[in-house]
Amino acid sequence: MTTVETVLGERFEVTTELGRIDLDVVHGWLSTDAFWAIGRSRETVELAARNSLNFGVVDQYGALRGYARVVTDQATFAWVCDVYVDPAARGKGLGLLLARTIVEQLRPLGLQRVVLSTLDAHGMYEKVGFIAMPEPQRWMLLAGPDVPGPGLD
């Protein structure tokens, strides 16, 4: 799937074709600048991408400007994660473009829940229909070894 949008006079494509998404760029972003993925290995980025629905924002010159992935069973549940926009392209609405495209792609699946975690983009996600978790006390987390606190170790 490829969607073409013009944002602030610039042409961008959102693609779900993994072959058009430069995972070296994604790895660079996530492993060095995304607080939730600092130090993530290139191998982990590739494995995660291969087992997810991927969304890449590509500019008119073919450069990757944004990325997100969705982990889903495509029947009841999806987790939106690793949402990242190139710092040089921020402020143009590319995060909103990614979020809107993801919602449009997931809606026909009839999922019961689509969840995500965000530190500072609540307002953007609300624009495409996300709400704060109504009963956060009902959710639990089994954290992995890189997450502070008790977990999988």
Where are these regions (language model features)?
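Conserved active-site alpha-helix within GNAT-family acetyltransferase domains
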Residues: 96, 108-114, 118-144
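Hydrophobic/basic alpha-helical segments enriched in Actinobacteria
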Residues: 15-20, 65, 96, 137
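Short amphipathic alpha-helix that is part of the acyltransferase structural core
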Residues: 1-40, 58, 150-153
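Active-site-proximal cofactor/substrate-binding loop regions of enzyme domains
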Residues: 85, 99-102
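A conserved beta-strand-loop-helix scaffold within acyl/acetyltransferase catalytic domains
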Residues: 43-61, 65-84
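Conserved acetyl-CoA pyrophosphate-binding loop and the N-cap/start of the following alpha-helix
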Residues: 89-98
